[in-house]
Amino acid sequence: MRFIKRFIRTIDAINDWVGRFLSYFLFAFFVLLFIEVILRYFFNSPTVWANELAQMLFGAYAILGGGYILLTGGHVNVDIVYTRFSAKTRAAVDIVTSTLFFLFCGMLLVYGGSLAWDSLSRFEHSQSAWNPPLYPAKLMIPTAAALLILQGITKFIRDVLILLGKDVSAGPTPGKGESL
């Protein structure tokens, strides 16, 4: 049981750190777009690279946040029904629906990993005038899938422990308005 709690705490801490890091990443994204708007509309001097970099940064931000969102209970539920269930019923429903979750994430890991490996092995670059490498952005897909799968495993373990009536207090507790 100690190993399980340590595993849960470790994965929760990793996804919590990634989520917090990404929140600062969003600030950099905002600054980048702000500078581009100023250059484009006030100085009539748009950059070649800002749009493409913004797409890559936001793509990484959006996909890498999945594990953190799962940790804090931010993914979509049918709350009107789900919140009326007891904790054990919610855990049972989550266990049943986790098969779809793991199927999707497994496919994302396998196919995203294949896409990333292909891009990395060819040192793929964009076809734009800026010509940045694309493989760092594509490597975010299997990385995000792995983080999401690991967080899904911790959620699955918590749900099983709830069904068994065990203590599930390992890891950070969700904030106000959030649930695991």
Where are these regions (language model features)?
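Alpha-helical transmembrane segments and membrane-interface helix-loop junctions
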Residues: 1-180
